[in-house]
Amino acid sequence: MSSQIRQNYSTEVEAAVNRLVNMHLRASYTYLSLGFYFDRDDVALEGVGHFFRELAEEKREGAERFLKMQNQRGGRALFQDVQKPSQDEWGKTLDAMEAALLLEKSLNQALLDLHALGSARADPHLCDFLENHFLDEEVKLIKKMGDHLTNLRRLATPQAGLGEYLFERLTLKHD
């Protein structure tokens, strides 16, 4: 059944939004895996785990924001299977942060592609939605992860375990 409120909302945009919902849910699932990996007793980097669990929540909220927008525009939310994270063992914080940065860059590219599609389909509402809720936040997160990687690489010495511990205590501290 078609929507009575749908206006200037192309089927290509609708499908791309559904794909982005899935990407955000997959990212949330991956960050949840990362968060609880670093919280294990044999890894014990609580601050790193907290950092990734917060990202899991942010990505889930992003998926919900897209779903609400989809309904407001008269689109239909079509859920797909959420792929499990690529691994269960994440290694050191440096390895995990590199994987997270790649994930965020792929999400950012998907957002940019959706923005370009919205521009091509003359959908100013979609472009405004992306600009106000996603694009700037994504760039800030990529910068933050890049900064964390720079500091983690500085600490990657023969005493890498000590460096990882100090990074976790000094950079990712939380109350």
Curated annotation (Swiss-Prot):
GO biological process: intracellular iron ion homeostasis; iron ion transport
Modification N-acetylserine, positions: 2
Keyword Repressor belongs to the record: no
Predominant location category: cytoplasm
Key words, A-Z: Acetylation, Cytoplasm, Cytoplasmic vesicle, Iron, Iron storage, Lysosome, Metal-binding
InterPro entries, per the entry: Ferritin, Ferritin-like, Ferritin-like_diiron, Ferritin-like_SF, Ferritin_CS, Ferritin_DPS_dom
GO-annotated cellular components: autolysosome; autophagosome; cytoplasm; cytoplasmic vesicle; ferritin complex
GO molecular function: ferric iron binding; ferrous iron binding; iron ion binding
Subcellular location: Cytoplasmic vesicle, Autophagosome; Cytoplasm; Autolysosome
Function as written in the Swiss-Prot or TrEMBL entry: Stores iron in a soluble, non-toxic, readily available form. Important for iron homeostasis. Iron is taken up in the ferrous form and deposited as ferric hydroxides after oxidation. Also plays a role in delivery of iron to cells. Mediates iron uptake in capsule cells of the developing kidney. Delivery to lysosomes by the cargo receptor NCOA4 for autophagic degradation and release or iron.
Name listed for the protein in its UniProt record: Ferritin light chain
Species assigned in the record: Canis lupus familiaris (Dog)
Gene it is expressed from: FTL
